Curated annotation (Swiss-Prot):
Originating species: Vibrio vulnificus (strain YJ016)
Region named Disordered: 236-261
Protein name as catalogued: Zinc import ATP-binding protein ZnuC
GO CC list: plasma membrane
Membrane topology of this protein: Peripheral membrane protein
Disulfide bonds, paired cysteine numbers: none
Quaternary context: The complex is composed of two ATP-binding proteins (ZnuC), two transmembrane proteins (ZnuB) and a solute-binding protein (ZnuA).
Biological processes annotated in GO: response to zinc ion
Keywords: ATP-binding, Cell inner membrane, Cell membrane, Ion transport, Membrane, Nucleotide-binding, Translocase, Transport, Zinc, Zinc transport
Binding site for ATP: G37, P38, N39, G40, A41, G42, K43, S44
Length: 261
């Protein structure tokens, strides 16, 4: 299976300081990849390269033709003096019908927020609205930079469930960045540990035993790391939190939005 994005021996240097050193990775349709690492490890730089905002100093970035990317930023900066409700905010990123924007909000369980002031949303509510904005692109690749930041533990669990549902509904690749090691989705297909270079990569349960992971984060982090396992003894929920039955992978994937060539 060909990768949506393939990075080969990619390096980035700022002012003679190597921020990323010989990074190679592939992102595949329907797979969740989580990037972990301490602050200053180069995670945000790698995200900028993946979404096309930055070019590497050396190495190759190969993207599938007409690749569509949905991006959820780490922080949302809005002008506090400008009144902005959720619907108006969503329409800033493109011309969408009210039906399309309401459907995106419904998918993430935020339909009730459509008239809410963006400045007054909680951390979890803001993340859901940002996810809705990304989904309006009908992405092949969903990139989430620290999606659980500012969200409480239960909110994080709900958010990770939502991301898992999105992966199945749209059959998209998900690339998620985090420095919080205390809650990592067991649904992640691959964890990549970054400290300017790739220290180690693999399944979440394997990474915590890897010598490079322990050297970087310490044995205490290994012992305290909680891998959230999705419970299979209850009804699955749709993206708005309603119980459903059947296979989520059978949902339709509509094509619409902005493309990266």
């Amino acid at each position: 299976m060909s990768a949506l994005i393939s990075l080969k021996a990619l390096s980035v240097t700022f002012d003679d300081k190597k921020v990323l050193d010989s990074i190679s990775l592939d992102l595949h349709k329907g797979k969740i990849t989580t990037l972990i690492g301490p602050n200053g490890a180069g995670k945000s730089t790698l995200v900028k390269i993946i979404i096309g905002l930055l070019k590497p100093t050396s190495g190759q970035v190969q993207r599938q033709a007409k690749l569509t990317i949905g991006y959820v930023p780490q922080k949302l900066k809005l002008n506090d003096t400008l009144p902005l409700n959720v619907i108006r905010f969503l329409n800033l990123s493109g011309k969408y019908s009210q039906q399309e924007t309401m459907e995106a909000l419904r998918l993430v369980g935020a339909e009730h927020l459509y008239k809410s002031n963006m400045h007054k949303l909680s951390g979890g509510e803001t993340q859901r609205v940002l996810l809705a904005r990304a989904l309006l692109q009908r992405p092949d690749l969903l990139v989430l930079d620290e999606p659980a930041q500012g969200v409480d533990i239960q909110g994080q669990i709900d958010l990770y469930d939502l991301i898992e549902s999105i992966r199945h509904r749209f059959d998209c690749a998900v690339f998620m960045v985090s420095h919080d090691l205390h809650l990592v989705m067991a649904k992640t297909d691959e964890v990549i540990c970054l400290q300017h270079h790739v220290c180690c990569s693999g399944a979440p349960e394997d990474i915590t035993q890897h010598p490079s992971y322990i050297a970087l984060f310490g044995s205490a982090a290994r012992d305290s790391l909680a891998i959230y396992h999705h419970q299979h003894d209850h009804h699955h929920h749709d993206l708005a939190g309603q119980p459903v039955s059947g296979d989520a992978t059978q949902c339709n994937h509509h094509h619409h939005g902005h493309h990266h060539d």
